[in-house]
Amino acid sequence: MSAPVTLQQLTDQLDALEQQATTEISEASDAAALEQLRVGLLGKKGRISGVLWAMGKLPGSERPLVGQRANVLKTQVQSLLAERLAAVKQAAMAERIARESIDVTAPASGIPMGHRHPLITTTEEIVDLFLGLGYSVAEGPEVEKDYYNFTALNIPEDHPARDMQDTFYLQGDLLLRTHTSPVQIRHLEQNPPPVRIVAPGRVYRRDAVDATHSPVFHQVEVLAIDEGLDFSHLRGTVMAFLKAFFGDLPVRFRASYFPFTEPSAEVDVQWRGRWLEVMGCGMVDPAVLEGLGLDPERYSGFAAGLGVERFCMVRHGIDDIRRLYTSDLRFLEQF
């Protein structure tokens, strides 16, 4: 037979457990140790449960006294565990903050910074100059219909001007646009005069890749339609733009031919001792206006187009267009 258990013995055990639990919990250094103590004190096979199991050997009148004392101890232990866990977490966070803190007075190693590609900055500068002249930006699709790329611009199917540019044809009447001029037609279909737009974008031609040609390049188209516009307005606009971009360089206009403008001209600037073609321009052909339902007796306008790569190469002294597409950091870091 097991030895008899007295009320005093169980009460003494609970008092001793209280002291032990208080000491052990206060010395626990992390959450794992506290969890181990919780199981050892409050679990089904824990030390407090062992006292409650022995309580069954007491007379019925004494059992409630032990049960009450055990419940008080459980509450105390739970409170001590919660308080210690909070303190441990706070200490761990403080240690982590101290360990991961940054000394803002230490010399910086520097983080390499990227920057915008010269073609992007050139395009943005060109567009900004025309925005300053009162123009607004218009855009159109790169996969274009034959009608907008050719027919609506006074270039019918049998027109010899179609031989002037090799085109990437797609299925049906779709193609990769060969210039940004289709934006003119699309915009005028939706917006009656007066119109002043600048249209930047990529264009595609079946050119062999060399120092001055690429099958994919960038253009900016300029269009103004209003009452009373003439060639002097075109010339004044082009001169103001070129002066703002290149500075005080000599400029000349040469008679030329474009199917959708009449008269037409090419614009050269004197650069490093030679004349360099930079733009094509002209007065919008009356046939183009009539095709849009506009009266050429009332409205007139001018258009101009330029290659962004050419402007970028002139501005930065680049001798090979392929350098702009190779993603060579040794080259791009210069800008």
Curated annotation (Swiss-Prot):
Keywords: Aminoacyl-tRNA synthetase, ATP-binding, Cytoplasm, Ligase, Magnesium, Metal-binding, Nucleotide-binding, Protein biosynthesis. One of its GO terms (biological process) is phenylalanyl-tRNA aminoacylation. It catalyses: tRNA(Phe) + L-phenylalanine + ATP = L-phenylalanyl-tRNA(Phe) + AMP + diphosphate + H(+). GO terms for cellular component: cytoplasm. It comes from the Bacteria. It is found in: Cytoplasm. Belongs to the class-II aminoacyl-tRNA synthetase family. Phe-tRNA synthetase alpha subunit type 1 subfamily. This is Phenylalanine--tRNA ligase alpha subunit. It comes from Parasynechococcus marenigrum (strain WH8102). The lineage of its organism: Bacteria, Bacillati, Cyanobacteriota, Cyanophyceae, Synechococcales.
